[in-house]
Amino acid sequence: MSRQWLFSTNHKDIGTLYFIFGVWSGMVGTSLSILIRAELSHPGMFIGNDQIYNVIVTAHAFIMIFFMVMPIMIGGFGNWLVPLMLGAPDMAFPRMNNMSFWMLPPSLTLLLSSSMVENGAGTGWTVYPPLSSGTAHAGASVDLAIFSLHLAGISSILGAVNFITTVINMRSSGITLDRLPLFVWSVVITAILLLLSLPVLAGAITMLLTDRNLNTSFFDPIGGGDPILYQHLFWFFGHPEVYILILPGFGMISHIITQESGKKETFGTLGMIYAMLTIGLLGFIVWAHHMFTVGMDVDTRAYFTSATMIIAVPTGIKIFSWLATLHGTQLTYSPALLWSLGFVFLFTVGGLTGVVLANSSIDIVLHDTYYVVAHFHYVLSMGAVFAIMAGFIHWYPLLTGMVMNPSWLKAQFSMMFIGVNLTFFPQHFLGLAGMPRRYSDFPDSYLTWNIISSLGSTISLFAVIFFLFIIWESMITQRTPSFPMQLSSSIEWYHTLPPAEHTYSELPLLSSNF
């Protein structure tokens, strides 16, 4: 047991560990979100303390980003699928792969500790000074959160190095870069973004750590520092981070839509690759659109507005290529395809509100209102999470060798779809009406939409529980697939379901007409 799970060097076992960890963290993060919506379901205090409320909001963000989406998408799907799609026997650095995983549980422990000692870190996930300074947040909470981020960051950087090396060096004969599966491309681009952005975050939070404990003044005006510097450093990481969260989802959706359409390949494969590369590149030069309210020059604001809008172009290319891939097929609405179609539609809606927020003059009004919350939850809660659900259902027979009940999955999709839209769509109206983020109380003019929003979150909670039940049911009944439904254009399906512990012991050769 300990050799298989504690000291594993097998990409499949490590990927499974990532999945288990991500699902567990996701349940913690979901519980926190239910607490937030319970507080906001009615005017007046429920938790009774704004500091505690902000600690819950901060922990919800950190857990969902660093311990749910990234471990499942990059660690879970990445580890499982990249070697199988490359025809590689394993990752390039199998032991480092194991270390990448085992840095995450200590990191999560540090984060949860930071919420439990002293007053907790009630800074929001951005951890802006002066609120996160030693004066406003005395005690160990913010320091523990910083150490947690350091560990999660090191884990991601090591994983990124591993994926890049694997894809460069371990492709089978015949898999040239232009024939690399789109999911593998998306993981490589994600890894490059991680490699370039995380060190900047590490620098920023290390400076914050020394400001708090070693009497430096990087972000303290009294000693000649500038809190705005922290914002620039943080968002230079933070904006690529949101593309890191969604890019592997793009890759998975491409595979699912292609295979469900019965097509040989995605429409415009090369265009899809260039679109992802462009999104990754542009993601690094738009960071200050998160800071339109800090008083930048008008020409700076004009630049960041236009640069942000340019990102909509490659994103649009991806959306329309997916629609073109679907074009002309007699669709069977399988659960994985339902999630993918939901992804395409809701991600587009989230992208449109993003274009609205890109206008610096409009953003002055909408900044730090629920409009922003609605925007990023549409792209994360209905982009990243829908992609995870689609991918998990699609590759579940490959991961486990079992099949889930498709009728239940469709019912569960309907529940979740209604739940998330009921939760986040009204938040656009709240934001336009000026309801600010990160406050636990609100005037009763906002009551109706908040009640509807909280009702939606309850529906989503039941949908998540239903999904766990569906997984449980599939595992106790042990239904096995008769044959893989997929086309031969995806080589991960050329195995027993689930694959043997060691696949590709003899390296495959891919012919030019696969």
From Swiss-Prot:
One of its GO terms (cellular component) is respiratory chain complex IV. It holds the Pfam family COX1. The chain crosses the membrane at residues 16-36, 55-75, 101-117, 144-164, 182-202, 233-253, 267-287, 304-324, 337-357, 379-399, 415-435, 451-471. Its EC number is 7.1.1.9. It is an enzyme of class 7 (translocase). Its cofactor is heme; Cu cation. GO terms for molecular function: cytochrome-c oxidase activity; heme binding; metal ion binding. Ca(2+) binds at E39, G44. Keywords: Calcium, Copper, Electron transport, Heme, Iron, Magnesium, Membrane, Metal-binding, Mitochondrion, Mitochondrion inner membrane, Respiratory chain, Translocase, Transmembrane, Transmembrane helix, Transport. Cu cation binds at H239, H289, H290. Component of the cytochrome c oxidase (complex IV, CIV), a multisubunit enzyme composed of a catalytic core of 3 subunits and several supernumerary subunits. The complex exists as a monomer or a dimer and forms supercomplexes (SCs) in the inner mitochondrial membrane with ubiquinol-cytochrome c oxidoreductase (cytochrome b-c1 complex, complex III, CIII). This is Cytochrome c oxidase subunit 1. It comes from Aedes aegypti. The lineage of its organism: Eukaryota, Metazoa, Ecdysozoa, Arthropoda, Hexapoda. The gene is mt:CoI.
